[in-house]
Amino acid sequence: ACFPKAAVREGKTADANLAASLNHMLSAPYIDANILGYGFDMVSMLVHELQVQLPMLQNYPTEEKLSSYDRYLIGCLLIQQLLKWHLVDSTYTCPYIPVYQMKFPTILEECRKRFQFILDHGYDTPEKVRFLLEHFIQINHLEDTLEVSEA
């Protein structure tokens, strides 16, 4: 799992949010993949998430006005949703794409590359997840903020 290097009690709640977003980006689709075979209605859950998250995304300013923190969180959300919708139907276009094309085109392109990297590498073992977490910490220049731990 990914953790902030400084304790939340030291006022580093933003760091904790960054770590949680990165962890959730990979863990939520992994969990969803494992419950699909048990009759779980994934599409209903994804549609509900869409109804909650799209209005929130539409309230954000365009990407040139976003803080680096918000860019990161919005990017993690899209990658997570791309992975989840890919589980349902790999040929289906994720319904988040039109909003990202309109408001966050650069973030969208970055996320598409990262999504493909995740698919190419896989995220179905602890070793693969650790590699991905370390990779995303590095490419986002968060080495001073986040670290990967076994705990």
Question: Which stretches of residues belong to each language-model region?
Answer:
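Post-HEXXH active-site segment of zinc metalloproteases
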Residues: 1-29
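Pan-zinc metallopeptidase signature
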Residues: 43-151
